[in-house]
């Protein structure tokens, strides 16, 4: 059995208060997540996790969809408290009755405790039953006035640590406009205005990762000026993206074919950012022209 501590978060609370958004937020923070786990299965699940040697951060949604919820949850929590390898925190999500009714009307779903179809009656019944669990919770969040993004931010602030900062990472990529914009790009920059190495016969078959092409692109005055502006724009906004709870920021730099100018710029940007941020560099279309030639 592993002697590593498992950081366990049980996400619970009122139906409709935002547990789906919450569990997605924990996944973005690097937690192993399970939605709608029956309380009776929790001890066995945790035993299996303890046998592994991996770092454990686990978030489980346990709520009213589990039919025997109230009969089992107290004994399960007692079992967890007795395990020295488990650090338990309970996140309880709440909202006003009127807000929950509004959300149910919007989604046209039925409340799990509304046997007669009256949502408000189900909400009141659930709220009454959850009073003991709410009193045991270390974190109670009222989501009445929170957007999904704001809820993600609250969870990130309360449950991330310095070691979790790696959960925010940067993707720097190059691409060719002729092959289409990257669908997942957050920031797109166009460097097609720069001198094109393609028209230099000696450089045509090389890429922006080759020193000769890199030097050709970067030694032009307009290239250096634009790059300095680009870096000056990006560096100050990265902490703001992280603060907002974004898990991946994709910065895409494009030229015509994605082989020369954009590759050189993306590579330089990645080199300058990687010392301070978790980063992955990729070049979507760097071999696209060669593949096209080979097929023809």
From Swiss-Prot:
Coiled-coil intervals, chain numbering: none
Which Pfam family would be a valid example here? PapZ_C
**Record carries keyword GTP-binding:** yes
Q: Name one GO molecular function term.
A: GTP binding
Binding sites annotated in the UniProt record for ATP: 13-20
Which UniProt keywords are given for this protein, alphabetically ordered? ATP-binding, GTP-binding, Nucleotide-binding
The organism sits in which domain of life? Bacteria
Q: Which residues bind GTP?
A: 63-66
Q: Which InterPro entries match?
A: P-loop_NTPase, RapZ-like, RapZ-like_N, RapZ_C
Cited function: Displays ATPase and GTPase activities.
Family (UniProt): Belongs to the RapZ-like family.
| PANTHER family from the UniProt entry | RNASE ADAPTER PROTEIN RAPZ
Q: What is this protein called?
A: Nucleotide-binding protein Sez_0730
């Amino acid at each position: 059995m592993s002697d590593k501590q498992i950081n366990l978060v049980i996400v619970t609370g009122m139906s409709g208060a935002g547990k789906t958004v919450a569990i997605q937020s924990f996944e973005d923070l690097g937690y192993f997540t399970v939605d709608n786990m029956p309380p009776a299965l929790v001890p066995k699940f945790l035993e299996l996790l303890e046998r592994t040697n991996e770092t454990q951060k686990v978030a489980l949604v346990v709520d009213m969809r589990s039919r025997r919820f109230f009969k089992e949850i107290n004994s399960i929590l007692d079992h967890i408290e007795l395990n020295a390898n488990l650090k338990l925190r309970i996140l309880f999500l709440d909202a006003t009755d009127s807000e929950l009714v509004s959300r149910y009307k919007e989604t046209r779903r039925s409340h799990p405790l509304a046997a007669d179809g009256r949502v408000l009656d189900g909400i009141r019944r659930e709220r009454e039953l959850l009073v003991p669990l709410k009193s045991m919770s270390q974190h109670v969040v009222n989501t009445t006035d929170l957007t999904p993004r704001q809820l993600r931010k609250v969870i990130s602030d309360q449950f991330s640590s310095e070691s979790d900062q790696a959960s925010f990472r940067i993707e720097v990529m190059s691409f060719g406009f002729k092959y289409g914009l990257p669908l997942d790009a957050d920031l797109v920059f166009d460097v097609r205005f720069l001198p094109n190495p393609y028209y230099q016969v000696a450089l045509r078959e090389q890429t922006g990762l080759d020193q000769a092409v890199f030097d050709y692109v970067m030694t032009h005055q307009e290239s250096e000026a634009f790059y300095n502006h680009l870096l000056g724009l990006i560096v100050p906004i990265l902490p703001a993206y992280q603060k907002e709870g974004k898990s991946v920021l994709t910065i895409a730099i494009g030229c015509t074919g994605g082989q020369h100018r954009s590759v050189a710029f993306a590579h330089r940007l990645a080199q300058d950012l990687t010392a301070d941020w978790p980063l992955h560099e990729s070049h979507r279309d760097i071999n696209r022209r060669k593949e096209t030639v080979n097929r023809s």
